[in-house]
Amino acid sequence: MQEQYRPEEIESKVQLHWDEKRTFEVTEDESKEKYYCLSMLPYPSGRLHMGHVRNYTIGDVIARYQRMLGKNVLQPIGWDAFGLPAEGAAVKNNTAPAPWTYDNIAYMKNQLKMLGFGYDWSRELATCTPEYYRWEQKFFTELYKKGLVYKKTSAVNWCPNDQTVLANEQVIDGCCWRCDTKVERKEIPQWFIKITAYADELLNDLDKLDHWPDTVKTMQRNWIGRSEGVEITFNVNDYDNTLTVYTTRPDTFMGCTYLAVAAGHPLAQKAAENNPELAAFIDECRNTKVAEAEMATMEKKGVDTGFKAVHPLTGEEIPVWAANFVLMEYGTGAVMAVPGHDQRDYEFASKYGLNIKPVILAADGSEPDLSQQALTEKGVLFNSGEFNGLDHEAAFNAIADKLTAMGVGERKVNYRLRDWGVSRQRYWGAPIPMVTLEDGTVMPTPDDQLPVILPEDVVMDGITSPIKADPEWAKTTVNGMPALRETDTFDTFMESSWYYARYTCPQYKEGMLDSKAANYWLPVDIYIGGIEHAIMHLLYFRFFHKLMRDAGMVNSDEPAKQLLCQGMVLADAFYYVGENGERNWVSPVDAIVERDEKGRIVKAKDAAGHELVYTGMSKMSKSKNNGIDPQVMVERYGADTVRLFMMFASPADMTLEWQESGVEGANRFLKRVWKLVYEHTAKGDVAALNVDALTEDQKALRRDVHKTIAKVTDDIGRRQTFNTAIAAIMELMNKLAKAPTDGEQDRALMQEALLAVVRMLNPFTPHICFTLWQELKGEGDIDNAPWPVADEKAMVEDSTLVVVQVNGKVRAKITVPVDATEEQVRERAGQEHLVAKYLDGVTVRKVIYVPGKLLNLVVG
């Protein structure tokens, strides 16, 4: 074996071996316990970033560990290949999205291989291929036939620049997240999947997910937003229809002093016919985008419609206002306002001088002071006629019952969750498999015309989708009648909602899933990805699993047993102010820094001499130019070093601060491991270990080895605290480096220890461990080696540390056999130089002995 650790030589050799031997390819094997380890599939943006590397390293560590436990481990990878960035890049680079995407996939695949991830490449899939999306199209047509898909006109956030619909989350401060253009509201027909039909199950089954982070489950609970309340109908004077509102607080109903409707509500539209102020307000609202986060903070505005509704219980007339905080697509498009007990209603009423009527007493039983704000806490009713004196629950039920009896109220369960709009007006996505016949009939694309293939050889103008721009593309014939294909494409969350299941049978040609394979591998045992996917992807992922279950394809209720959300990767960020006052961000790689004695950055400049402002650690991003290229790091230090640093620098679910000094530290550690194995193997063959012939020191070292195995096993397997596992291995390495290597049993013990260390490090740093395992003459390839098992007998402490005091002052610490008597301990203590010195010529008056812990000799 060569003396120096040269990762660039060994890593490519080991990777070639894995490729040729197809080491990580697996098939169903009923005789073995399966383990399905999955990291969220990447978008092929062109290059891997450190966030990817962290995600996939965690996955690979878990997969390799489970494999060493003897399980049949599936770890696949693929590409979430549709999406808007490809269109932008294609326009910029004067190409089409398909070649750009496939080039990126090829490049990033090499990067993944360079990092040594143990993927089953035979299962690789790209979601932009017809072989993949054809099954999604087929499934969609089946959902349509089941009544779970429908088309309706809905108001969307429209970016006039990108010519596309934006999700609420993609609108930042009223502007498009990509191009910063002001967003408009537009009504267009769209396809929806009825996720609301599964709302209760999606909510209740969160309780089954014991190994998902509570934060994610809470976010999903809030997103689904189940509430119990009452739907109340109001008559409106001089208006043909009634108004219906939903409230979760019927106990406050006697304090309702006005109603508010959305600008798009038919009542507001009718009132605007002869009210120019209202018409202008409706126009303004139409172009204001409303994401919920902004709804809470934006200025509340409204205009009186002039209509009066009649309070069903008091008979009072109350005004109906059009307001910008009511959304047509949420609930009924109308709300009842109780300004005394709802802060938003209070602010609106105060602004426009509307009546504020308190109906709930303060906690101390007094009338509430509403001069500054609403009283939003629940309490006892007053000012409420027959309901006075009732507490919240009693009032809720009494008022709900009365409204129901009168025929103007109905108890309802409501959800915040909306149906999933899956239409996108983009080109680079899977075509939606629906057609419109000449006579206006809308129907699913017939099976014999699936897949509806997206043409890849197109010219992008950056504005109109090529399949919308080409009238010929949409033309088809169905049942002998001319028909037009849908030119919208699927939301790309569709592809990522079921890919995990297709990995179990990627070549299956008879349908979406081969149930036998799917039910062998599913559910996923651990799913690893960022918490930013908590509500969108992870909710659709769960929803799709239930849809596939109800179609008879899978037999489990949930797609993944455990979810691990890795933390973000942070790096130093620097900028200098340019001539026009703009910030120019400088890569941390190019910053020349001065640090104080605590290692903190106090001064920085770049090669051109600009004084740099240091803004601290922040998430690696293009905008701050503080991303570190993983490829550069792998070329400099080797993949094993990068992987080890990633797993050691911080717990997997916490943020990780990228520090090159830490990477260098990881590299030094691997060099030490290499050196120790080199020095050990250079001495030739090793005798068998005879555990009965070991000295006390050898037994103590062997105890450390096996205690480390036990700790690392628990840290990786149960606790998933990978950083503490690595720390324990490092600690053991320090002891091994100091251990004697002259005697036959010293070397036999070192052999046992190194074989254990190399196997424990293998999930983290597989290339160096593959090589060292061969040098240590381990059996077969380390990829098929079993995880080391701690020897219980070796861990039994046969000696213990006793503190020796003279007159209460510590004079020595001695190691004695566990079963030593007090006499033997006193005798052993007397042999210590310092103890003997303080006992010389004095009488021991009293002995205090705590067995196995303390010996205190009181002398006088």
Swiss-Prot record:
A motif ('KMSKS' region) lies at residues 619-623. InterPro entries: aa-tRNA-synth_I_CS, aa-tRNA-synth_Ia, Leu-tRNA-ligase, Leu_tRNA-synth_edit, M/V/L/I-tRNA-synth_anticd-bd, Methionyl/Leucyl_tRNA_Synth, Rossmann-like_a/b/a_fold, tRNAsynth_Ia_anticodon-bd. One of its GO terms (molecular function) is leucine-tRNA ligase activity. GO terms for biological process: leucyl-tRNA aminoacylation. It comes from the Bacteria. GO terms for cellular component: cytosol. ATP binds at K622. CDD domains: Anticodon_Ia_Leu_BEm, LeuRS_core. Transmembrane segments: none annotated. This is Leucine--tRNA ligase. It comes from Escherichia coli O127:H6 (strain E2348/69 / EPEC). The lineage of its organism: Bacteria, Pseudomonadati, Pseudomonadota, Gammaproteobacteria, Enterobacterales. The gene is leuS.
